[in-house]
């Protein structure tokens, strides 16, 4: 039996509609417009695409979008000054510094200079610690999007066995913590995990976030399990013509879909949820900053 496809594109549209509804209410009832500031250093083509998309969706949700584009040779002091100015700006409720930064800039230093309350990426060490102790925090966008889709599909996740493949600070570790906070029994697997196929076969939920194209085959998946594929990998596609490529996840989609009960596709699965959750975090931050009731269903 073919797996149910978890349509991240459709679910992200639903989340963005919820965000827009809350933004309208905040404007009408309190005269406040949530604002998201994005800082881009340099001219990395992929980063430019992401920043444009974030700005477009921010405006479509009714929020203010502030873009700060800096030269690739911008000094650390100048970048810190921009972040400090945004920290102090009451019209800015979310701050995102687009990664990666040029090599001469200390990413950890820059990220930890952001006001934790405005850290809508959820990367500040204070937010990492709050999430790790089960307290209110800003939650990283990609893991939050995965959690939302899992909750939508399953309802309660309590008691389920979950395996997260990947231990990055951006996805793997916070994803595991979110699942633990939802009362899953969680295993974090990685490149050194012994008997990885057997570990994965015991999971009701598999989150693949390792960055290796089609690493997880269908025979690793427990029948009926839910597979969340975070990977976005570009591989050669000679069947499309010379020099052509295609996007694949960390899971071999066709074989996993034959065994799984539900699966996210690549593209169109986790990816669209990341920006939707960035908008959700910005609204949440705005509400917290102004002592307003937080919107339900838009955070962990």
UniProtKB/Swiss-Prot annotation:
HAMAP family per UniProt: THF_DHG_CYH (MF_01576)
Function noted in UniProt: Catalyzes the oxidation of 5,10-methylenetetrahydrofolate to 5,10-methenyltetrahydrofolate and then the hydrolysis of 5,10-methenyltetrahydrofolate to 10-formyltetrahydrofolate.
PROSITE patterns: THF_DHG_CYH_1, THF_DHG_CYH_2
A biological-process GO annotation: methionine biosynthetic process
Reaction catalysis annotation: (6R)-5,10-methylene-5,6,7,8-tetrahydrofolate + NADP(+) = (6R)-5,10-methenyltetrahydrofolate + NADPH; (6R)-5,10-methenyltetrahydrofolate + H2O = (6R)-10-formyltetrahydrofolate + H(+)
InterPro entries: Aminoacid_DH-like_N_sf, NAD(P)-bd_dom_sf, THF_DH/CycHdrlase, THF_DH/CycHdrlase_cat_dom, THF_DH/CycHdrlase_CS, THF_DH/CycHdrlase_NAD-bd_dom
Subunit structure: Homodimer.
Taxonomic lineage from the root: Bacteria, Pseudomonadati, Pseudomonadota, Alphaproteobacteria, Rhodobacterales
Alphabetic keyword roster: Amino-acid biosynthesis, Histidine biosynthesis, Hydrolase, Methionine biosynthesis, Multifunctional enzyme, NADP, One-carbon metabolism, Oxidoreductase, Purine biosynthesis
Membrane-crossing segments per the record: none
GO molecular function terms attached to this record: methenyltetrahydrofolate cyclohydrolase activity; methylenetetrahydrofolate dehydrogenase (NADP+) activity
Record protein name field: Bifunctional protein FolD 2
Organism in which the protein naturally occurs: Roseobacter denitrificans (strain ATCC 33942 / OCh 114)
Enzyme Commission identifier(s): 1.5.1.5, 3.5.4.9
């Amino acid at each position: 039996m073919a797996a149910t496809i978890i349509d991240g594109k459709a679910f992200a549209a639903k989340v963005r509609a919820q965000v827009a509804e809350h933004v309208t209410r905040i404007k009408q009832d309190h005269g406040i417009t949530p604002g998201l500031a994005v800082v881009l250093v340099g001219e990395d083509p992929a980063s430019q695409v992401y920043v444009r998309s974030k700005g477009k969706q921010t405006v479509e949700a009714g929020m203010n979008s502030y873009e700060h584009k800096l030269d690739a040779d911008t000094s650390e002091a100048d970048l810190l000054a921009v972040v400090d100015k945004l920290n102090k700006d009451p019209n800015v409720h979310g701050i995102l510094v687009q990664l990666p930064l040029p090599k001469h800039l200390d990413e950890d230093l820059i990220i930890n200079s952001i006001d934790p309350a405005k850290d809508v990426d959820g990367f500040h060490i204070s937010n990492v610690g709050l999430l790790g102790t089960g307290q209110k925090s800003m939650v990283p966008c990609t893991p939050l999007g995965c959690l939302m889709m899992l909750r939508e599909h399953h309802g309660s996740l309590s008691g389920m066995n979950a395996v997260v493949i990947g231990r990055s600070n951006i996805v793997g570790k916070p994803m595991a913590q979110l699942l633990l906070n939802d009362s899953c029994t969680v295993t974090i697997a990685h490149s050194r995990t012994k008997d990885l196929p057997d570990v994965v076969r015991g999971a009701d939920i598999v989150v693949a976030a390792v960055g290796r194209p089609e690493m997880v085959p269908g025979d690793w998946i427990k029948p009926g399990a839910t597979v969340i594929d975070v990977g976005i990998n570009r591989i050669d596609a000679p069947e499309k013509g010379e020099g052509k490529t295609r996007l694949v996840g960390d899971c071999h989609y066709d074989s996993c879909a034959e065994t799984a009960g539900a699966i996210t596709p690549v593209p169109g699965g986790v990816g669209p949820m990341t920006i939707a959750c960035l908008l959700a975090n910005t609204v949440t931050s705005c509400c917290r900053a102004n002592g307003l009731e937080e919107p339900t269903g838009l955070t962990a």
